[in-house]
């Protein structure tokens, strides 16, 4: 297993143990720290990028629910640092942990797919005594595509979100089938956004960067992206 992946798993486990069983049932782990957990190809895992934070989403009822949740986090050892400009960020012994509510009215931002992603999250056994909730791979792709649209500056070469997407396409052979059988609205969104991505002038370079220039894997990623882009159902 890649060193970066080992570090990421340790970070996730640290957060999970601090949260405890009860709070673990309320949150879902998302973002780049979870990419490797969804990848089944060991070669691809070697190229997983390191990220210095752990991201989670949570469903809370309005401001009162959000403040109550934050109090529970403080009781578990999470703190707010005055040095952090990210309003959803807390610290756990120096580790940056971002808790994002699925209601955009609470903090002024969210991701359009968070609510459905929470509802469809799957259990993942991280350790013998720890089970976390994780996005399904189609929702991982959808949340990353939505994030890329908002902060990627239309530059797949510089986007960590795009890097995570391409790594998952490369390292999860079953992804195309999983998207194919997903909810129509989700499937169409992914297919249409991937179609736009394939038209981008820099996508070839982005893919080459992710797969370290391996011609076989470049072709494989393109083939899977083409299949995904063809899953849109106009009807």
Task: Describe each PLM feature range.
Residues 1-235:
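Compositionally biased terminal segments of proteins
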């Amino acid at each position: 297993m890649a060193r970066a992946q080992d570090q990421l798993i340790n970070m996730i486990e640290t957060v999970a143990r601090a949260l405890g069983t009860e709070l673990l049932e309320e949150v879902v782990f998302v973002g780049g720290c979870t990419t490797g957990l969804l990848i089944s190809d060991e070669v691809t895992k070697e190229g997983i990028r390191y990220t210095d934070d752990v991201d989670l989403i949570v469903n809370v009822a309005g401001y009162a629910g959000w403040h109550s949740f934050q109090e529970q986090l403080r009781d578990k050892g999470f703190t707010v640092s005055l040095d952090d400009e990210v309003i959803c960020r807390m610290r756990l012994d120096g580790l940056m942990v971002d808790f994002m509510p699925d209601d955009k009215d609470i903090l002024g931002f969210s991701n359009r797919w968070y609510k459905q992603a929470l509802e469809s999250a799957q259990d993942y056994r991280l350790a013998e005594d720890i089970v976390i909730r994780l996005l399904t791979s189609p929702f991982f792709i959808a949340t990353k595509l939505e994030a890329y649209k908002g902060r990627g500056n239309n530059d797949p070469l510089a986007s960590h979100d795009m890097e995570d997407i391409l790594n998952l396409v490369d390292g999860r052979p079953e992804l195309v089938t999983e998207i194919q059988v997903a909810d129509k609205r989700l499937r169409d969104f992914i297919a249409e956004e991937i179609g736009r991505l394939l038209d981008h002038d820099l996508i070839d370079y982005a893919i080459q960067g992710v797969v370290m220039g391996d011609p076989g894997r470049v072709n494989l990623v393109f083939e899977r992206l083409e299949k995904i882009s063809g899953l849109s159902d106009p009807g």
